[in-house]
Amino acid sequence: SIQAVYVPADDISDPAVVAIFSYLDASLVLSRKIAEKGIYPAIDPLRSYSISLDKDIVGERHFRIAAKVKELFQKYEELSHIISILGIDELSRNDRLIAKRAERLRRFLTQPLFTTSSFNNREGVYVTREQTLEGCERILNGELDNVDPDTLYMRGAIL
């Protein structure tokens, strides 16, 4: 079944929320902070999880790419505090690369969904799991480092 859980004041560490989450096989955590940036669906990839994200279920490649995506977003979250104070130009070359790839990845993971087309005036697009994995892998590997991140927003697949 699918359950909606109200999280008081967006506090995922609330004892009642923690108790409920322990019974769930998967959790998609929606974030106001991500939604404020215009990223939809506004799923927080660092706080969302699924017990089905297992090598034996999704395969080695999918598992590896998902782990690298989470690792990149985690590093970016750590850098975001520095970026908000000093700006991205004050980061080391490697940290700037991490931040820029994370932004590309965040934009790529936006979805032009069929169910939201009447709200955002964007035609829905079907994207296969393989296309999503391929796009994530290309961003992680730096193949799209010279691509404007805005071209990845609500795009669907990278062809």
Predicted regions and their residues:
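Conserved catalytic/coupling modules of large nucleotide/cofactor-utilizing molecular machines
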Residues: 1-159
